[in-house]
Amino acid sequence: MNYASPRHAGPLDALLIEVDRALQVLSRSAVAGRAYPAHAAEAPLADTEKRHAAGLMRVNHVGEICAQALYRGQAVACRDAGTRELLREAAAEEVDHLVWCDRRLKELDSRPSLLNPLWYAGSFALGVAASVAGVPRNLGFMAETERQVEAHLDEHLRTLPAADERSREIVRQMKDDEAGHRESAERAGGIPLPAPVRGIMRAMSKVMTGTAYRL
């Protein structure tokens, strides 16, 4: 099934599209629309460095699982056609990130998080809930999500093993894309979220990253 949602899909069609998307994401069968950005030669890494790089890329992979589900949840409950399209476009670009992180995990002889089904389900539900708050808050939620993801990616660029340029190339491209998503949401009318909401989002993100690094 095509990732793009038909503009006039009925409720059953919409449900089938979301189920298909979830299955493709969770089964690791999604296909990137852009070329793999890692071009540097694979450098030798010590076992501890390899495990650390894999842990960070697993965190990034979970982040893309969550972004995929979050934006799909926001879009499915959003009544504004323009906002829906913006969310779906961002979700489609996140597929590239998802596939890139998965490929890098394989190169590092590692695996995605064992909890991915839970991350996806929870994020989809959160996206639906965010959409109920209205378009400005919905877009504000998207912008804040991307802002926090950018901060995580900056940290990963600092803490990845010095020799792991392949992972860095992926993370740099992801960071550029996330900044574009944030700017698009702000231009479309997203408003800043209240400080308590931003704090809750950071706390939830901290739990996710700490867990995904190991599991």
Swiss-Prot record:
Residues that hold Fe cation 1 according to the record: 64, 94, 97, 178
Q: What is its EC number?
A: 1.14.99.60
A GO term, aspect molecular function: metal ion binding
What is the membrane topology here?
A: Peripheral membrane protein
SUPFAM superfamilies to which the protein is assigned, alphabetical:
Ferritin-like
Describe cofactor binding as the record notes it. Answer: Binds 2 iron ions per subunit.
Q: What is its main location?
A: membrane
UniProt GO cellular component terms: plasma membrane
What pathway is this protein said to act in by its record? Cofactor biosynthesis; ubiquinone biosynthesis
Q: Does the keyword Ligase apply?
A: no
Q: Name one GO biological process term.
A: ubiquinone biosynthetic process
Q: Where in the cell is it found?
A: Cell membrane
* Superkingdom in the source lineage: Bacteria
What InterPro entries does the entry give? COQ7_proteobact, Ferritin-like, Ferritin-like_SF, Ubq_synth_Coq7
Protein name (database record): 3-demethoxyubiquinol 3-hydroxylase
Instruction: Specify the species.
Output: Bordetella avium (strain 197N)
Q: What is the lineage of its organism?
A: Bacteria, Pseudomonadati, Pseudomonadota, Betaproteobacteria, Burkholderiales
